[in-house]
Design a protein with these regions (language model features):
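Soluble secreted/lumenal catalytic domains
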Residues: 1-145
Length: 145
């Protein structure tokens, strides 16, 4: 996403291990901005498990997020007490794209991380992006089918 990284630095795969903020894109999306709670310990565990699995994660200790995180959070999770998120990005936007096999390996590593996590949180994965959504317009929240 150019909104997150610009055209100058597009990571193949990235996990956000720190602060998450929607402020920069909130007005465009028509929603309240501000911080979004991150499950930092689990994010670091996913990162470290990935490194042990030879996943070459990039990581961000602070990231202003756009519609790809803000809309699902706002519509599904914001009103639930205690819910924390971990944004994870795979480059499917700018060539060279992450290879399917590598994306699968990352998913398997994430599964191992969650299964080996000592916490008692329930973990849900949201897949967002692609050409399946209207961003910042009157159709926001509806799937383009």
């Amino acid at each position: 996403h150019y909104e997150n990284f610009g055209p100058h630095c597009i990571p193949s795969c990235l996990v956000v291990t720190g602060d998450i903020d929607l402020s920069a894109h909130a007005q465009t999306l028509g929603m309240a901005g501000g911080p979004i709670p991150n499950n930092e310990p689990l994010a670091r565990h996913i990162l470290e498990t990935g490194y042990a699995d030879d996943i070459d994660w990039a990581f961000s200790k602070s990231l202003g997020v756009d519609h790809s995180v803000g809309v699902p959070y706002h519509m599904s999770l914001k009103k639930l007490p205690g819910v924390r998120i971990i944004p994870i990005y795979l480059n499917c936007v700018v060539a060279p794209f992450i290879r399917n096999r590598r994306a699968y390996q990352i998913g398997q590593s994430m599964l191992r991380a969650v299964q080996s996590w000592s916490g008692d949180e329930r973990v849900v994965v949201f897949g967002t992006g692609g050409i399946s959504h209207w961003v910042g317009g009157p159709g926001m929240g509806h799937v383009n089918v």
